[in-house]
Amino acid sequence: MAPEIHMPEPLCLIGSTEGHLVTNQEALKILSAITQPVVVVAIVGLYRTGKSYLMNKLAGKEKGFSVGSTVQSHTKGIWMWCVPHPQKPDHTLVLLDTEGLGDVEKDDKKNDTQIFALAILLSSTFVYNTMNKIDQGAIDLLHNVTELTDLLRTRNSSDSNQTEGEGPADMSFFPDLVWTLRDFFLDLQANGHAITSDEYLENSLKLKQGSDERTQTFNLPRLCIQKFFPVKKCFVFDAPALGSKLSQLPTLSNEELNSDFVQDLSEFCSHIFTQSKTKTLPGGIQVNGPRLESLVLTYVDAINSGALPSIENTVVTLARRENSAAVQKAIGHYDQLMSEKVQLPTETLQELLDLHRTCEREAIEIFRKHSFKDEGEFFQKELESLLSAKQDEICKKNADASAALCSTLLGSIFKPLEQEVAQEFYHKPGGHKLFLQRMEQLKANYRQQPGKGTQAEEVLQTYLNAKETVSRTILQTDQVLTDKEIQSKAEQERAEAARLEAQRLEAIRIQEEQRKAEMERQHQEQLRQIALEKARVAQEQQWILKQRAQEEADRIKAEQEAQLRALQQQLQHMREMNHHRRHHHDCVIS
């Protein structure tokens, strides 16, 4: 949902300076910010007939458009008030209050015609406000003699089939007509029957039969009005108040107003809110704030230049302006998307092209959303051409960014090699091989680094090509030093062979001496082992003899102990026998 436009009070949209119409930039800026479709209600009528009062009621405010209570006209030019539409979500109601027609104090009567024409051209509902009744003067004023048909040309200059008096080619562009009759005092009757206000309007615009000049003069404005305004509505208003209260009308509450007037006003506002259509261009293209702004500028420029504002040319001009703006909006959207999505350099060109195509599709969608009547896809082709140039530009930037990054990376990675070359580190036999190995190592390191972009190999190859001279110099130095080294190496090898032979012979001598020494050591060891064995055997024999002697002593001791025990037993036995005998003898005596 688009944000609501906060406009606390009306602003002058179109004024007049020294006979020329001028637009108010502040009001145009407000229009340019309204992205919603607009319902444009403009009111035109004689000065001092209460137009501003009706417009304030449509705005839902007691104050806003200037309401006067004197005979002087208050509103000058066209004033604009943009408010949220009370019954159509996502729509803005644009109210246009106009300078009163027929002001006796105004010198330039042509300005009336210009204001009148602009109100019709800009509105989707045109409110024609008159007093008392529909009379010939009111019809003539609406017709504005023959200037109305001239100012509202819509036919192609090449359209010769449309005859004078026919209506516009695309009636959808023209507003619905709402005729308001203020202080209406007549009875709504015809032929003795009650009629509606709409029937009263239709009866007032009926054509007379006949072809005489007087009849044609009578019919011409009516025919013109019928052709230009196929959708018509009429509202009649009783006097809002009586006497001195009329001068206080803006401050009166509904209770202080004529109840019939309050009812009439309510029905009028309800009709405007529910029936007023969105402003459209030929082809059914809805008008938003910027498109309405372009219409204002186009019509004012045409009128100031003395040209007649052709609706067809206006739509072409508007389409050109809006499509050009749509191209710029699409390009801006593309630039924003690319800046958000693309991080240069991309790893591959295809990655960048895929991002470009995604953003390109969105940009074209933005263009299609904000463009209209792009005949032959002229502006879309222009956009595609600009996007193609953008692609070339971003690809070049991508390549440049990749080249710069890779050059910096190469400088960092190959810096040690550069220092070694400067120090003639590779100016030695085999130096070229070492140089090439070092190059391969650093190239592998470089290729492993991520995010280098599309120029990685090209920048590397350029660097390697630049090092070809260095490589050849190292190779030549290597070859010269290698030849000398080969000769020196041969001599060194011969000397080394002699040294090795001497070492071999010396080793043989030493080994022989070591062998003899080892044999002597082994012989001595054998002798020592024999002596040790003899000593061990002798010691063992001595132990055996000692053991045997001990055993013999133990045997003898055991025999002696046995003999002693036998003797002791005999002695004990003898004692026992003696004791027995004594005891027995004692018994016999007693």
Curated annotation (Swiss-Prot):
It catalyses: GTP + H2O = GDP + phosphate + H(+). Residues 35-277 form the GB1/RHD3-type G domain. Isoprenylation is required for proper subcellular location. It comes from the Eukaryota. Its main location: membrane. Low expression, if any, in many tissues in the absence of stimulation. It is an enzyme of class 3 (hydrolase). It is a lipid-anchor. One of its GO terms (cellular component) is symbiont cell surface. Residues 529-590 are annotated as: Required for tetramerization, but not for dimerization. This is Guanylate-binding protein 5. The lineage of its organism: Eukaryota, Metazoa, Chordata, Craniata, Vertebrata. The gene is Gbp5.
